[in-house]
Amino acid sequence: FDMELVNKGELTPIYFGSAMNNFGVETFLHSFLELAPYPSPKQSKNGLVDPMDNNFSGFVFKIQANMDPAHRDRVAFVRICSGQFEKGMSVYHVQEGKKIKLAQPQQFMAQDRTIMEKGYAGDIIGLFDPGIFSIGDTLSENDMNVVYEGIPSFSPEIFARVHVSNSMKRKQFQKGMAQLAQEGAIQIFKEINIGIEEYVVGAVGVLQLEVLEYRLKNEYGVEPTVNRMPYRFARWITSKIDDPDELKLTSTTKTVHDSDDRYVLLFENQWSIDWALENNKGLELIDHM
């Protein structure tokens, strides 16, 4: 056992126990308090930010809708990276360039919520989100130049076409798809010249599609139809193109838009990617944004 390797993320302590039988839980929690490292400096676009810096700053790393089904609330989870947080303080939403008040910060323990009065680097706070936050957003008390690097996203490897047959449920369907995509649980794409009554969904694993279907049914009252598609790769076009229809692509390649209206090509295999690059001079593709 080497604590230095643990702090580097190269070694992970493992505890055996049972939460259901309350065996080993207390031992784990006490050890966790002893082993957990102090908050480390966080990389921003302008360099490392010291957790002891007086300026409060943090970033949104998770968004969760419908945590309380009775109120249809949406919570943005923020990790404090520096300074001291206080309930009711005003901070800059750096990406929007606006000042916002953090009026009802919450702390979560299982199903219990408590109002959080103060917080420090390393703490997690939950903020009510009326739709102004996105994953990766930076909050800063005084310094608008603090911009933390975004959360890395993984290129989807499983794709499905998702639609709802009941036209009366279309509004709930669109809301559910948009909110679940904002959480980062899935990536949604729109086929060109096709309306928003159906989406192409990209996921890293099959479980994400199952969770999507379950949450649409239970949280939004929608019975979706999910049909798997044969694609295995998504590639974003970074080179300038006027008309994607002018690209020379294999017959099995599909062109779609992502949620920010960027062109994305869906491929069935690596050969199709290589063929597109060889037959379209200047075409540049990346596997995630």
Describe the residue ranges of each PLM region.
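Structural and coupling elements of P-loop NTPases
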Residues: 1-289
